[in-house]
Amino acid sequence: MSNSNNLFDQIKDEFTREGEMFETRNIRDDKGFPITEYVSFPDNLKGYFDIGRLHGDKEFLIYENERFSFNQTLDNAAQFGNALILDGIQKGDRVAICMQNNPEFIFAYIGIISIGAVCVPLNSWWVADEIKYALEHSDAKVIVGDIKRLQGLEDVKDLKKIITSYTPNDNFVSFKDYVKDHPKILNEVEIKRDDNATIYYTSGSTGKPKGVLSSHRGIISTMFSWACISKILTERENRLGNDAAPLTDPDLSILLCVPLFHVTGSHVAFLMSVLVGRKVVMMKKWDAGEAIKLISEEKISDITGVPTQTWELLNHPDKDKYDLSSLKTLAGGGGPRPAEHVKMLDDNFEGRPGIGYGLTETNAIGTLVTGDDYVSNPSTAGRVVPPLTEIKILDENWNELEEGK
């Protein structure tokens, strides 16, 4: 294991040195705080989403009987952004989304952020009063939602309500009608790296849900860091003589089986796929039997959810009726996976198990482990994701603990 760790560190140093893809530099952010950032780095998430144009007509979003390419997705997003601008939405304004997973969630998400507004994904499991609280707390001017969420908001004034086309209702303007005839190209807006991009709500340990602001810099840094550790791990496996498919493999795809209002859904499954050109197969809600069918039909290579979901796949009565050999990773987060489950997953799927630890406040990044490292140490949460992440473990008096304590 020590040789493997030494090789990991060696490759990390190679990939982050001057002139390489993940070269870093030390600077001060807009508030004067010292930070480390990637040298090769989009100025904002609008520039990050433009990377999707490089994937062109390649399939990006699959939802039920619909299929959208990267270009079609970004065209829809641009139309939504332009419609918001015509409605008076300006840089820094908050626009909420509250609905089950569907492509219009992603169109809206990209469009909101690309015009410099702040995207506020709300928990679609909330009741009306909880949604109203978050709308008021975030000072949202617009909400895009489905009928179940919008029907409880009739008394909310000064809030434009747009209904997803997947649950049409004559009392609300539909997403398709709202974006119709608007340009598919967005004009450039001055957006700085440290400008706010999103507000996600966490359950909070006490009291009401807490709104977590994230910047363009923070979100892009997470995506680049995940790409960095993926390339390090792939290169390490290759040098050790093992086969490993890189994250940039053009045939990779991921099953989006968790809500987009959670960073596991939006960041791990959706946003990361923009960078690497990965196909995203969307589920409106979790169903293990349906997931098995989709994995087989769409040749899904990656699944990331809570550990319970992969456990349900393993124990589903239809598992052996379908070809699931396309799976390369069965990752989890949001809680620990029982140690005894790790080997069972590894023994019963061709894909390798993995686990990660992160927070809404960190854009889901923190630690990560997969493959042999995980199987041999199934109680671990993994290594710190390089090269930007730092983790300290403190005691109750805020003193940093020594290693092993």
Segments (PLM) and residue ranges:
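AMP-dependent adenylate-forming
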Residues: 22-30, 46-69
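Conserved AMP-binding/adenylate-forming core of the ANL superfamily
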Residues: 37-40, 57-102, 106-110, 127-132
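ANL superfamily adenylate-forming
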Residues: 65, 148-193, 208, 220
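Conserved AMP-binding A3 loop
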Residues: 69-71, 197-225, 231-235
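A short helix-loop-beta submotif of the ANL/AMP-binding
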Residues: 81, 94, 100-120, 124-128, ...
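Conserved pre-ATP/AMP-binding loop-to-beta segment of ANL
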Residues: 183-201, 208, 244-253
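Gly/Ser/Thr-rich phosphate-binding loop
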Residues: 204, 275, 297-305, 314-376, ...
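Conserved AMP-binding/adenylation subdomain of ANL enzymes
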Residues: 220-256, 261-301, 316
